[in-house]
A protein has these predicted regions:
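Short aromatic-enriched loop/helix-cap "lid" or pocket-rim segments at secondary-structure transitions
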Residues: 44-50, 121-125, 201-203
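A solvent-exposed, charged loop/short amphipathic helix patch at secondary-structure junctions
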Residues: 130-157
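Conserved phosphate-donor/acceptor-positioning beta-strand/loop module used by diverse small-molecule
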Residues: 105-125
Length: 267
């Protein structure tokens, strides 16, 4: 199988969306190192954003704290290719700090989505939105100043509202980045449900500029505890009642002048 050098690949995704599996898929087919999340003690603040970076970006925007993190991280990308599917990066300035660098022309961003009911139920059974520090490090929180989706309508969904808000916020951010930056960085939009099939995986492989067929690694990082059927039905009922168009939300934000590059001062 002929392979083209992947150059630089990152993802824009929410987490619990198949990013670990995607890292294995890319490693297996490129026969190259593919990082999911660098979690060594010394990685935080250098290769992996810490809570300060995550909170700074989502409260104040792309400020000095965030930019200094990205200067450190991007300075480590020196080899011919670099692949990382870490979902936290897109929530703390990946696009803003990449699109004007020499890497941008050779970078591909995989916008990875998942069925919203499966995605949301995964967060809930793991209690991902019970402790605020988990949301600070890995996800987002509605208390942040910079957000695209109003969280107030989700408050009535007791027990699932935070996780649901996060799903819609990330869908809006994916649409926002695609609208605002896809002319500067190549973006490839896929769903987990599609790329774990042979046909879908091959479509992704070809979208990455590759030739021939690819192979699929086994499933990875799946929840050990299955979501109760009652939870799944509850989420299906809620999501079917919500009128939401991520592209419309993103376009309105752009029309209103929203940008994470507009930095606000700390209180």
């Amino acid at each position: 199988m002929r392979k083209v050098n992947p150059k630089v690949i990152f993802t824009l995704t929410a987490g619990r969306t198949g990013s670990a599996w995607l890292a294995d898929f890319l490693a297996q087919n490129y026969q190259a190192t593919s990082i999911h999340e660098p979690l060594g003690i010394e990685d935080f603040g250098v290769r992996m954003p810490d809570i300060k970076v995550m909170r700074s970006f989502n409260n104040y925007g792309n400020n000095n704290t965030v930019q200094e993190f990205w200067e450190r991280k991007l300075s480590l990308i020196q080899q011919n290719s670099y692949i990382e599917t870490n979902h936290t990066l897109g929530k703390c300035g990946l696009i803003e700090n990449l699109y004007q660098t020499p890497f941008a022309a050779d970078t591909k961003i995989i916008i990875l989505k998942r069925n919203i009911v499966k995605q949301c139920s995964s967060y809930i059974v793991r209690n991902d939105f019970v402790h605020i520090t988990t949301a600070w490090q890995w996800y987002l929180h509605p208390s942040y100043q910079k957000k695209l989706v109003n969280h107030t309508p989700f408050l009535k969904f007791d027990g699932v509202g935070l996780a649901l808000w996060y799903c819609y916020e990330m869908a809006a951010r994916q649409a926002f980045y695609k609208l605002a930056y896809s002319s500067s960085i190549k973006m490839i939009e896929v769903s987990l449900e599609d790329i774990v099939t042979p046909k879908g995986a091959n479509r992704l492989w070809q979208a990455l500029g590759q030739f021939g067929t690819c192979t699929l690694p086994p499933r990875k990082n799946e929840n050990q505890i299955q979501a109760p059927k009652s939870l799944v039905q509850h989420l299906k009922k809620i999501t079917s009642s919500i009128q939401f168009d991520a592209d419309e939300v993103a376009q309105q934000a752009l029309n209103d002048g929203f940008s994470f590059e507009n930095v606000s001062a700390a209180a």
